[in-house]
């Protein structure tokens, strides 16, 4: 059984931890509010551009023989893909990072079964550390972008993949990130950015156009903006989810510390009471001995 001094030290240590986790929760709550605002400003645009690109893809069925953009092509034989993974640079956010990593490993295994080669581009220190530890090769490592999403940097990263896609060096571009649903929920999203799926059933009307070089140039510009903003939005979404997960984790840690302090205090009081009782018994025994 621990001594009174040891119990007192434990209580003090847990209380200090409780103060730290409470402070971290408050910081995460404030950061989450800002991240939520950024998501709200961007979500509708991201949804709309995604909707527009898939609608264009469907309508291009009428002129697909005249349009030579690989972004809208149906690629039968997929040999190599770019997988872009987004995690946090920091931990202490529950299962936020590991959920994304697990989904990535699952996708890698599925692609390997199909004999597909993978170029893994990893954004976020935690995933980079994990993949290095387990010996999974990475094509590109990016630290700092998930903590501070930047459109220009996201565009630069995705454009390298796009150029390789156009040049037929890769056949797919896939993103994986843990996204924000609400303050209590996060969800891992796996999205195939390119090629953009063509579904004739999605549209009853087709484009009535005379395809030319200008038309293809406009489409190519739209595709670039689409993939750039898709990655940028995924970064914003991931950051909001990270702060949400960390806020929950620190709240749970604070509550656990509070419960531990309560239990240790009970144990301390019990030990102190036993010590006092023991001392009283010794005093009474000594007095009785002196009387004899």
Swiss-Prot record:
Location in the cell: Cell inner membrane
Membrane topology value: Peripheral membrane protein
Pfam families: ATP-synt
UniProt KW Cell membrane keyword: yes
GO biological-process terms attached to the record: proton motive force-driven plasma membrane ATP synthesis
Cleavable signal peptide: none
CDD domains linked to this entry: F1-ATPase_gamma (cd12151)
A GO term, aspect molecular function: ATP binding
Domain of life of the native organism: Bacteria
Subunit structure, interactors included: F-type ATPases have 2 components, CF(1) - the catalytic core - and CF(0) - the membrane proton channel. CF(1) has five subunits: alpha(3), beta(3), gamma(1), delta(1), epsilon(1). CF(0) has three main subunits: a, b and c.
Family the entry assigns: Belongs to the ATPase gamma chain family.
PANTHER family according to UniProt: ATP SYNTHASE GAMMA CHAIN, ATP SYNTHASE SUBUNIT GAMMA, MITOCHONDRIAL
Role, per record: Produces ATP from ADP in the presence of a proton gradient across the membrane. The gamma chain is believed to be important in regulating ATPase activity and the flow of protons through the CF(0) complex.
UniProt protein name: ATP synthase gamma chain
Originating species: Nautilia profundicola (strain ATCC BAA-1463 / DSM 18972 / AmH)
Gene: atpG
